[in-house]
Structures are given as structure tokens and as C-alpha cells.
């Protein structure tokens, strides 16, 4: 087996070895074509051809594009092997921004409120990536003025959460996760920040003329503010 983690990239692999002996301890040779190494879950798992590397010793590689534990059992067309099995652990590869995404909630926030950003970090094979040290998300757009973002909280399942405190400016807000100064999602998440409810204390009404005779008209102006 490799000395370190084996990445689920379809390239790095474990080497499984089966030593076959008879009841007297003698090597059982010539069985390569009748042996099988079978994964319990074949999704994303590739088992190489079995070869006899020395008398009675059989070997094959196992790779995967699926992170997590892979249980492999050994079978023989000729002999009863019992429950010979091995558990192999594959880990996610490096972050792939093209396979990662970010969402914002709520989708129509109000100025002065908060927005929750959820970043889903994945590798090139859509495995969740957890061991990262991302920077705080970047903010852009009109509503970014006066807005601030917290750092990310690792949820432990490949998702990360950050809180954005909005400023007093309405308009579009774009949020992008960053890792080592680079974009960490395929696209930025966008929302439109809207003005707060109309405030009677801040809004004003003005009339062009103080005194208007019956039947005449005047202009009334409402300056609406939140």
C-alpha cells in the first residue's frame, strides 16, 4: 500500500496482494485467471488485471474517482476463500473551482440586513473537499459599498458558511469565494439588495403652494426614503 493518502483521481492506486497457499503451506500457482478482486460498490472504482508476481502471490491495482472507503473482496473460481476483504481509503483531490458553487440566502435581502453565503467545495470528480483555508469571500456590485463579510465556517461536509452584513446601499451584490487569491467557484452568486420599508420619519411631502382655491390645482411632491 502507499505510505500516504491515496487521492480519488483515477490515477493514484493501491496495490492489493493475495498470497495463496494450500493446507501444507505450499504456494498455489497459476490461479491469476481464476481470481477476482471485486469492489462492494463499483461506482468510480477500477480494478486492474490480476497478475502472479511470484509463485502463489497475486497482485492488482485499485484506483477510484470516488472519495471514501472502498471495500474489496477476493473471490476464486476454484477455491473457497471465505471472507477475504480489504478496506481502502481514498481522499478528495484539490479544489476544482469549475465544479464548486456558491449560493446566497435570502435571494432578495434588505439593506442593513444579513445574507448567508453557502459555498460547496468540490474536486474535479465532484468529491466534497474539506481541508481548505479559504479567505473571506469577495464582494462586488453597488450593494457591496458598506457591506462586510465574515470568514468561512467549515461545516465538515464540503460546504462552508459565511455571513454578510449589508450596508445601506441597494442594488446588485456579487459574492465570490476565494482560495489563495483565486476564484473558488465556477460563478459568483448574485442577489439584488432592496431598500427597506418606507419610513415616515425619513420621507417628506411638500406642496408647491400653501393656499389653493377650490377648482385650482397644485403640485404635491413625495420624497420617499427608507
Give residue spans per PLM region:
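Short amphipathic beta-strand segments in non-cytosolic proteins
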Residues: 34-49, 135-150
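Aromatic sugar-binding surface patches on proteins
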Residues: 53-60, 155-163
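Assembly/interface hotspot detector across virion components, adhesins/toxins, and nucleic-acid enzymes
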Residues: 50, 104, 152-154
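A broad, low-specificity signal marking well-ordered, structured residues that form hydrophobic/aromatic
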Residues: 35, 58, 86, 137, ...
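Short S/T/G/P-enriched beta-strand
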Residues: 1-29, 41-42, 55, 66-130, ...
Amino acid at each position: 500500500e502507499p505510505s500516504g493518502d491515496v487521492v480519488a483521481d483515477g490515477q493514484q492506486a493501491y496495490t492489493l496482494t493475495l498470497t495463496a497457499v494450500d493446507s501444507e503451506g505450499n504456494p498455489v500457482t497459476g490461479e491469476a485467471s481464476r481470481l477476482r478482486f471485486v469492489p462492494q460498490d463499483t461506482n468510480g472504482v477500477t480494478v486492474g488485471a490480476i497478475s502472479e508476481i511470484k509463485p502463489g502471490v497475486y497482485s492488482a491495482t485499485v484506483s477510484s474517482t470516488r472519495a471514501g472507503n472502498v471495500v474489496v473482496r477476493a473471490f476464486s473460481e476454484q477455491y473457497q476463500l471465505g471472507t477475504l476483504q480489504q478496506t481502502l481509503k481514498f481522499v478528495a483531490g484539490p479544489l476544482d473551482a469549475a465544479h464548486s458553487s456558491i449560493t446566497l440566502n435570502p435571494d432578495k435581502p434588505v439593506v442593513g440586513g444579513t445574507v448567508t453565503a453557502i459555498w460547496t467545495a468540490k474536486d474535479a470528480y465532484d468529491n466534497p473537499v474539506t481541508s481548505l483555508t479559504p479567505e473571506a469571500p469577495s464582494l462586488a456590485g453597488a450593494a457591496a459599498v458598506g457591506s462586510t463579510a465574515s470568514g468561512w465556517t467549515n461545516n465538515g461536509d464540503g460546504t462552508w458558511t459565511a455571513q454578510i452584513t449589508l450596508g445601506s446601499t441597494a442594488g446588485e451584490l456579487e459574492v465570490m469565494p476565494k482560495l489563495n487569491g483565486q476564484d473558488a467557484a465556477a460563478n459568483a452568486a448574485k442577489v439584488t439588495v432592496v431598500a427597506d420599508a418606507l419610513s415616515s420619519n425619513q420621507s417628506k411631502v411638500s406642496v408647491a403652494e400653501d393656499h389653493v382655491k377650490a377648482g385650482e390645482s397644485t403640485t404635491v411632491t413625495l420624497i420617499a426614503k427608507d
